[in-house]
Amino acid sequence: MEFLIFSDSHGSASNMSLALDRQIKTPDAILFLGDGARDIDNLFVVDTPIWAVRGNCDWASSDYADKTERLLYFEGHTILLCHGHEWGVKGGLGALIAHAAEVGADIVLFGHTHVPTLTTIAAGETVGKTVLSRPMYLFNPGSIGYEGSFGVLTFKGENVLLSHGKL
């Protein structure tokens, strides 16, 4: 299963379309992490589910981005989608990590900073009152609108693969 991840398009639906066109195969789903949610309405994909959240610049939400946070469940993993502004990610990831542990997420996808990021917290580490039973992955695809960066999440058996791409 493979997901194409976008954040922070800020009016550049064309960059999302270009990234989608450059994929070897059509992703199983598209995940959008806020700031440009209305751009999703201009993204033409057939039979590809889209899950999205609103960011701090999404005053009028798209039909897809009616919430600021979503939990998805795939391949035995709990995926937290959020923009990150509500957790102060520009100042650090501590609050977001604590929240992810509280809701049981082991894959955390966020935007807001426009900086591609991948951080892993090892299984067995303590986060707040929670001892992680599996690794926690924190991933920011960067800004598809400004820097042309995006992400890909792939599940292969027990493995979680997260990678960054650039136009």
Task: Give the residues covered by each predicted segment.
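Active-site neighborhood of phospho(di)ester-bond hydrolases with catalytic His/Asp-centered motifs
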Residues: 5-7, 29-35, 51-56, 80-83, ...
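Short, acidic/polar N-cap/turn motifs at the starts of alpha helices
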Residues: 67-71, 115-116, 128, 150
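Pre-active-site segment of Zn-dependent metallo-hydrolases
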Residues: 15-22, 81-83, 87-100
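Binuclear metal-dependent phosphoesterase catalytic core
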Residues: 17-18, 75, 98-103, 125-167
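N-terminal active-site segment of His-dependent metallophosphoesterases
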Residues: 1-50, 62-67, 148-149, 157-158, ...
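Helix-adjacent hinge/juxtasegments
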Residues: 49-90
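Active-site environment of divalent metal-dependent phosphoester hydrolases
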Residues: 10-15, 37-41, 57-62, 87-91, ...
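Conserved beta-strand segments of alpha/beta enzyme cores
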Residues: 2, 49-51, 78, 137, ...
